[in-house]
């Protein structure tokens, strides 16, 4: 059986580990989110891809769900002594080695997909891990800021989540997505899958940002395979965690799930999921305050398919309303 999963970080990685235990003979391809990617201290960091890699490769810090087990922080301590920031995102020494290799290879001209394949070779992953795109696409969040022009400004999702602890969001911005295309192998993995799985990753900033890459949403909609979403049940999940400057972890509230039965593509009323949060894909230079409303990302499917989408209960996306499932 060929299984293709669209996955974010912690939730997706843990689901994949269970999937492999349940279906050890399956050929699994994972299409990973790159929206969390960023450059810090000159290093290209891919949090979600690395979390999947470390988890399935046996190197993850199990208690946190991210970062390396038995990590040390000598470099971070030295940077702090020099007064070099930012101090809200701590990189471990082992983790830095991964980022050094990635940055060096990308600087030499290798695309992210080739770099990811090379990094995964070391970990002997039981899956094929693909970035959703080789292009640089980052998720930014528009927040209120009385001191900014127009009263709003956009920050990188990692800063929004880790440093600012997820204040009310006004828009989700996929910066650079207009010029992006699926990484090699992504569309083929979707078209050739026997099952397409949406793990319990955040539907807005993990699954949604993958579907935002031009061509991926339509490929999922056109795929002959069933599309199955797996979500947490309200009150049973401990929520997701985020790193802090003091290396402790902050846990978000429990999650809830919404089950949606998808109608035929040619029905008079397909199904989609909307939310009271603007979503926009535009360049970084556009005015953040002019972000236009758009529907949240979700795949269109055929009759008889059931999708249970995971909805995190953090501020901006905890009031999603199930209506229909049409992009």
What name fits each language-model region?
Residues 11-16, 205-210:
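Short glycine/serine/threonine-rich phosphate/pyrophosphate-binding segments
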Residues 210-217:
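Charged helix-capping and loop-helix junction motifs
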Residues 1-3:
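Extreme N-terminal starter segment of soluble prokaryotic enzymes
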Residues 24-26, 223-227:
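A short helix->loop->beta-strand "cap" motif at the edges of active sites that frequently abuts
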Residues 15-26:
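A short, Lys/Arg-enriched amphipathic alpha-helix followed by its capping loop at the start of a domain
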Residues 33-174:
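Electropositive, gly/pro-rich neighborhoods at or near active sites that engage anionic ligands
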Residues 240-257, 261-269, 274-275, 279-302, ...:
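Low-acidity, Ser/Thr- and Arg-rich intrinsically disordered low-complexity segments
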Residues 193:
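An anion/phosphate-binding loop that grips the pyrophosphate of nucleotide cofactors and donors
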């Amino acid at each position: 059986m060929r299984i293709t999963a669209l996955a974010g970080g912690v939730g997706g990685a843990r689901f994949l580990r269970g999937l492999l235990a349940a279906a050890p003979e399956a050929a699994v391809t994972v299409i990973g989110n790159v929206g969390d990617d960023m450059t810090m201290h000159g290093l290209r960091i891919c949090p979600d891809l690395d979390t999947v890699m470390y988890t399935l490769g046996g190197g993850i810090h199990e208690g946190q769900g991210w970062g390396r087990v038995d990590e040390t922080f000598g470099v971070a301590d030295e940077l702090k002594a020099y007064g070099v920031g930012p101090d809200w995102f701590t990189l471990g020494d082992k983790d830095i080695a991964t980022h050094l290799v990635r940055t060096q290879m990308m600087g030499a001209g290798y695309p992210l997909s080739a770099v990811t394949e090379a990094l995964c070779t070391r970990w002997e992953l039981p899956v094929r891990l693909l970035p959703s795109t080789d292009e640089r696409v980052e998720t930014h969040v528009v927040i209120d800021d009385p001191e900014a022009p127009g009263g709003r400004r956009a920050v990188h999702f990692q800063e929004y989540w880790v440093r600012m602890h997820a204040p009310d969001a006004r828009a989700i911005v996929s910066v650079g997505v207009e010029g992006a295309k699926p990484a090699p192998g992504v569309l083929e993995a979707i078209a050739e899958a026997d099952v397409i799985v949406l793990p319990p990753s955040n539907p807005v900033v993990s699954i949604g940002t993958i579907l935002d890459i031009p061509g991926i949403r339509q490929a999922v909609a056109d795929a002959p395979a069933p599309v199955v979403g797996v979500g947490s049940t309200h009150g049973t999940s401990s929520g997701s965690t985020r790193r802090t400057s003091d290396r402790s972890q902050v846990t978000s509230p429990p999650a809830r799930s919404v089950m949606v039965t998808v109608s035929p593509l040619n029905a008079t009323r397909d199904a989609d999921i909307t939310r009271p949060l603007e979503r926009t894909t535009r360049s970084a230079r556009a005015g953040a305050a002019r972000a236009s409303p758009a529907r949240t990302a979700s795949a269109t499917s055929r009759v008889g398919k059931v999708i249970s989408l995971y909805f995190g209960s953090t501020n901006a996306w905890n009031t999603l309303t199930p209506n229909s499932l049409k992009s």
